[in-house]
Amino acid sequence: MKHPIHVTSEIGELQTVLLKRPGKEVENLTPDYLQQLLFDDIPYLPIIQKEHDYFAQTLRNRGVEVLYLEKLAAEALVDKKLREEFVDRILKEGQADVNVAHQTLKEYLLSFSNEELIQKIMGGVRKNEIETSKKTHLYELMEDHYPFYLDPMPNLYFTRDPAASVGDGLTINKMREPARRRESLFMEYIIKYHPRFAKHNVPIWLDRDYKFPIEGGDELILNEETIAIGVSARTSAKAIERLAKNLFSRQNKIKKVLAIEIPKCRAFMHLDTVFTMVDYDKFTIHPAIQGPKGNMNIYILEKGADEETLKITHRTSLMEALKEVLDLSELVLIPCGGGDVIASAREQWNDGSNTLAIAPGVVVTYDRNYVSNTLLREHGIEVIEVLSSELSRGRGGPRCMSMPIVRKDI
């Protein structure tokens, strides 16, 4: 097998992708805890699974190998000590390591098979799953006060964010929100211990222990030499700067990092919710991220005089900055919703800008964003629509739901 991770663009033919099928974690959402768990609504599990299966099969029909996070994680934990270590870390990071409850929960979780263990951790552990006789603390007995020992992880079907493939390596990300912080631990163990990856010594350009957050929805691989990263509600400028320094000092292909500042709000959560690449010279964009004259804050980061310095150049036009770093004389920014103020806001909320390119000029989108899809087709893009009534409730689209592992070079 060649190197197991290889992504040098957003649009190269997709060969291998990582998904997570929605599971019990979705059914453990309740209205009282939606905000805490970063959801706006509760998807209906049978339908969201059906829609996700349709999405996965759509990719397979185009020759894409589909891997599942939950399966890889279970396969990585073959060693008994490794299982115990993983459970300890999950409980600690999930703040379920309070007093004796830690040991009780650990014994409970380790009683399951690997597959069941992973599903249980992802789905959450409720207080009523532990025998009352084993509960020694007041908070354990108060199920109505808070029902979980270990919170569910309903955002896991957005595999884009906890880690991102960059060249032949990846970033394993520190997630900004506590509800998602544990998610990248799965990828850490998969890369270190799954036989598909472990023997290849995959470079980690930035790991989850770095103190400032970065998320994969903000990381876009424009070409072999250039990546774009959103400075957003979820990704900090300090993390981008550290990643740029690490890349410039540890490899020689990526030469520029484009830091793109976007409004810090839930609707514009990551760069890929407002901006994606669909062809060599075509991008989707939500017009609301630009100022009245199309102005934005964009910074081109390049290697400085030594490993700890950067050359930083400020630009105010996204189009001009893209033309500069991609060496293009012309390019097209396709507005989400066709620029209509109502359609644009509605379709961006339902991830009209969150396209997944599976080849140059070929994208997967949600069927509900018909204005944006029509406009993409008018620009010569092949649009493959997938079902979206329940998937879209999590506020993420096809790009959010997929982590490319291998793409062909363009």
Curated annotation (Swiss-Prot):
Q: What class of enzyme is it?
A: hydrolase
Q: Does the keyword Cytoplasm apply?
A: yes
Task: Quote the subcellular location field of this record.
Answer: Cytoplasm
Recorded coiled-coil stretches: none
Key words of the record: Arginine metabolism, Cytoplasm, Hydrolase
The record's active-site residues are 400
- What reaction is this protein's catalytic activity? L-arginine + H2O = L-citrulline + NH4(+)
Known EC number(s)? Answer: 3.5.3.6
MF terms in GO: arginine deiminase activity
Pathway listed? Amino-acid degradation; L-arginine degradation via ADI pathway; carbamoyl phosphate from L-arginine: step 1/2
The Gene Ontology biological process terms listed for this entry are: arginine catabolic process to ornithine; arginine deiminase pathway
What is the predominant subcellular site recorded for this chain? cytoplasm
Q: Which GO terms describe its cellular component?
A: cytoplasm
Q: Which Pfam families match?
A: ADI
Q: Which family does it belong to?
A: Belongs to the arginine deiminase family.
Matching NCBIfam families, A to Z?
arcA (TIGR01078), PRK01388.1 (NF002381)
The protein here is known as Arginine deiminase
Source taxonomy:
Bacteria, Bacillati, Bacillota, Bacilli, Bacillales
User: Source gene?
Assistant: arcA
